[in-house]
Design a protein with these regions (language model features):
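TRNA-recognition modules of translation machinery and tRNA-sensing kinases, especially anticodon-binding
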Residues: 2-143
């Protein structure tokens, strides 16, 4: 997700992006938590950053699956991105970005959280229509 918006709207957009990202994890029914990252840990570009971490049953801890940053006008100033108000004055936009799905990390979260005792895994309900109704993937015996 990428958003360019007016400064007064950037906080609301950041929260909306967080909601969009949360819906993916809720749909997949993967245990997750939201971390409001400390400003000392986000560097100079972002003014606010969330990390979404998914549960790893294998490691018995959370690991990062997605990040969402509100960079306010930092990037826009360097890129010269402005918008014009109706009265003709110009203002730098605020830029926001979010990881949609980090594919390999999401695959790990799905496989770990849906693994069966037999070594296969259950296909999350929300993904079953894309798997032609397949509900479980079982291991194949090799000789």
């Amino acid at each position: 997700q990428i958003v360019l918006c007016k400064s007064q709207d950037s906080h609301a957009w950041h929260e909306r992006m967080l909601g969009n990202t949360e819906k993916m994890f809720q749909g997949l029914e993967i245990p997750y938590r939201i971390v409001n990252v400390c400003t000392g840990d986000i560097g100079i570009v972002a003014a606010k950053k969330y990390d979404i971490e998914g549960w790893s049953p294998r490691e018995k801890k959370y690991f990062e699956l997605a990040s969402l940053s509100n960079c306010t006008s930092y990037q826009a100033v360097r890129l010269g991105i402005k918008f014009v108000h109706p009265d003709g004055t110009k203002e730098y936009v605020h830029t926001l970005n979010a990881t949609g799905i980090a594919t390999s990390r999401m695959m790990r979260a799905v496989l770990e959280n849906y693994q069966t005792k037999e070594g296969g895994f259950t296909v999350p309900t929300v993904l079953q229509p894309y798997m032609y109704g397949l509900k479980e993937i079982r291991p194949v015996e090799t000789r």
